Amino acid sequence: MRVTSPEIQRGIKVSELLDMFGSTAFNARRLGEAAKICEEMVKSDSFVFLTLAGAMIPAGMRKIVAGMMQNGFISSLVTTGANIVHEIVESLGIGHEIGSCYVDDTALAEESINRIYDVFVGQEAFERVEEFLSGIIEGLDGIYTTYEFLWEVGKRIPDERSFLRIAAEREIPVFCPTLHDSIAGLHMTIYRKNLQIDFFRDVSRIIDFCFQKRKMGVIVVGGGVPKNFTLQAMLLAEGFDYAVQITTDSPQWGGLSGATLEEAKSWCKLKPDAKAVTVYCDATIALPMLYAYLLDRCGES
């Protein structure tokens, strides 16, 4: 099969462009392969995890995550405490501002503005989050998994487009193994009375999912704890059938975010014949394109 140049025409769909990428090279081809694997995941009725590391919510990816839940493209989300906090910031109508990385950060601090590369968020946003969460935390009694606690949070979020609210309404588990490593964790430490979070029950539940009699898939955005928490659950099962990883890290430094999916096969986290591809690309580019592809090719799952 020859490499062919995409024939770009006015009105082309994202799905058509990604199909053309499949006969190009480098990471365009990898992104085209990822689209096909994601399509097969959904159409085969696989149980699909989305793992989300990095500052994806401040970067504007919340509606992509929510849409993937609403359309049945993902079955569970595994993410960081930071992304949860920033989703609450968005859900309360505060939001994040377009900023710049070429600024005087000391001057920003004096104005109570926090910087996430080229995104700004005011300190008052986190004060609003504290006000919102404190009432929930103080009112809960007993032992919860992270996803059960986040369902309670989601039930109280007014924004219908919030992925936390959608997850609560549909009982989609949102695992957050680093919930305590976030501003939300600080608030829980301060305000909890009889509330306890059982992280080990999270592990038991995600392992249960991995033993289902259906195909299993994972879309890995970045790496870190969400990636490891999800892949390690397969150590006791048979391994994932499908896997797509979007990362900007490379493997030779030995870090998990750059570890290839082929390496994961040595741990039996992926089946030997698993369909898998790693796309080296900014996830804020690749993830929306994959979502648009699935909308066109799969509709509502």
UniProtKB/Swiss-Prot annotation:
<dbReference type="InterPro" id="IPR029035">
    <property type="entry name" value="DHS-like_NAD/FAD-binding_dom"/>
</dbReference>
<keyword id="KW-0808">Transferase</keyword>
<keyword id="KW-0520">NAD</keyword>
<dbReference type="InterPro" id="IPR002773">
    <property type="entry name" value="Deoxyhypusine_synthase"/>
</dbReference>
<keyword id="KW-0386">Hypusine biosynthesis</keyword>
<dbReference type="InterPro" id="IPR022899">
    <property type="entry name" value="Deoxyhypus_synthase_arc"/>
</dbReference>
<dbReference type="Pfam" id="PF01916">
    <property type="entry name" value="DS"/>
</dbReference>
<comment type="pathway">
    <text>Protein modification; eIF5A hypusination.</text>
</comment>
<dbReference type="GO" id="GO:0034038">
    <property type="term" value="F:deoxyhypusine synthase activity"/>
</dbReference>
<comment type="similarity">
    <text>Belongs to the deoxyhypusine synthase family.</text>
</comment>
<protein>
    <recommendedName>
        <fullName>Probable deoxyhypusine synthase 1</fullName>
        <ecNumber>2.5.1.46</ecNumber>
    </recommendedName>
</protein>
<comment type="function">
    <text>Catalyzes the NAD-dependent oxidative cleavage of spermidine and the subsequent transfer of the butylamine moiety of spermidine to the epsilon-amino group of a specific lysine residue of the eIF-5A precursor protein to form the intermediate deoxyhypusine residue.</text>
</comment>
<feature type="active site" description="Nucleophile">
    <location>
        <position position="269"/>
    </location>
</feature>
<dbReference type="GO" id="GO:0005737">
    <property type="term" value="C:cytoplasm"/>
</dbReference>
<dbReference type="InterPro" id="IPR036982">
    <property type="entry name" value="Deoxyhypusine_synthase_sf"/>
</dbReference>
